[in-house]
Design a protein with these regions (language model features):
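Hydrophobic helical membrane-anchoring modules
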Residues: 257-261, 269-302
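A conserved hydrophobic position in a structured secondary element of the catalytic/binding core
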Residues: 53, 215-216, 275
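A C-terminal functional module that forms or caps the active site or interfaces directly
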Residues: 225-260
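A structural signal for short hydrophobic beta-strand segments in well-ordered beta-sheet cores
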Residues: 23, 167-170, 264
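Conserved N-terminal catalytic core of the sugar/cofactor nucleotidyltransferase
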Residues: 1-11, 28-118, 125-126, 130, ...
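Short, surface-exposed amphipathic charged segments that create phosphate/polyanion-binding patches used
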Residues: 87-98, 161-166, 278-282
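Phosphate- and divalent-cation-binding pockets in alpha/beta enzyme and binding domains
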Residues: 60-61, 128, 223, 250, ...
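Conserved core of the sugar-phosphate nucleotidyltransferase
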Residues: 127-214, 218
Length: 302
């Protein structure tokens, strides 16, 4: 059976809280969101996990998360170093911000050599999402065929402020494009987005969005590197300290030049995350409810 890897983008994990040890648990047993993702991934069939982290957080990450997971997974680490860039590109003076999700994933080249799924560390995706992506990858032999788990926008927003989501265009179950909207606000059963804080545009609650749960072949890592230089050269002309190389940028380019296709795997799960401190109570309530329903045991892994 082919090895299918779970890649977790965790370089920014804990930054809002002053460190990993300051992340508040979401249940009385002390679990944080990534614990549930790892548990769901294990149940789906994943046995290899790669954590993308900052080099300086490795010891704390191993202590808080990595060492515990070595009982269940083969664990590897990838560093998202600011200066790991294509030849000819240099870090602008004063730049401290990471280069974005596309760069994070590109750093896995040489470590991930087969099919893999990728997730954010601080999003709660739900059990079925991992089963769907694992089953797709297990059955797929064409390296140009990717997948994305698609959520309904109404299941991924918060009452407490804006969220960033990849708004998807879909035809016959296949992704035709994804647009990053960085300021989406809940509005009743629907939502609206703004680019400038003044003009707002409606989005239907049933709109399918990406939560960065993708299934790829290792070929995408070559694509990410091949396209990064041109993107950053152009982006740094106008925004050298803050521009980001987002993963959907490369997916869109591959869709446009027909070097890849992306099947959308619909998911009716509700997303949970602590985008805002006020979100914590609803996440805790949801976890308690799922435990009461038997979806999770009180103590994971027992």
């Amino acid at each position: 059976m082919r090895k299918i890897t779970l890649v977790i983008m965790a370089a920014g994990m804990g930054s809002r809280f002053g460190g990993l040890k300051q992340i508040e648990p979401i249940d009385p047993e002390g679990h944080i969101i990534i614990d549930f993702s790892l548990f769901d991934a294990w149940r789906a069939g994943f046995r290899d996990v790669v954590f993308i982290i900052k080099r300086e957080m490795e010891a704390e990450f191993q202590e808080c998360i990595g060492d515990r997971m070595e009982r269940y997974f083969h664990v590897s680490y990838v560093y998202q170093d600011l200066d790991r860039l294509p030849e000819g590109i240099e870090v602008p003076e004063g730049r401290t911000k990471p280069w974005g999700t596309g760069h994070a994933l590109a750093c896995c080249k040489g470590v991930v050599n087969g099919p893999f799924a990728v997730i954010n560390a601080d999003d709660f995706y739900g059990r079925t999402a991992f089963s769907e992506i694992y089953d797709f990858l297990a059955a797929q032999t064409d390296e140009s065929k990717y997948a994305m788990v698609g959520y309904r926008l109404k299941n991924t927003v918060t009452e407490f402020g804006s969220v960033a989501r990849g708004v998807c265009e879909i035809e016959d179950g296949m992704l035709t494009g994804v647009t990053e909207r960085t300021k989406i606000f809940k509005k009743g059963a629907d939502a609206e987005y703004t680019e400038d804080g003044e003009h707002f545009f409606p989005l239907a609650g049933d709109t399918i969005v990406s939560m960065n749960l993708w299934g790829f072949s290792a070929r995408v890592l070559d694509e990410l590197w091949a396209r990064m230089g041109a993107f950053l050269t152009e982006a740094m002309k106008t925004n050298p300290l803050k521009c980001e190389y987002f993963l959907p940028f490369v997916v869109n380019e591959q869709l446009a030049d027909k070097s890849a296709s992306v099947q959308v795997l619909p998911c009716e799960e509700t997303w949970y995350g602590v985008t805002y401190r006020e979100d914590l109570a609803s996440v805790k309530e949801a976890v308690a409810r799922m435990k009461a329903e038997g979806i999770y045991t009180e103590e994971l892994w027992k």
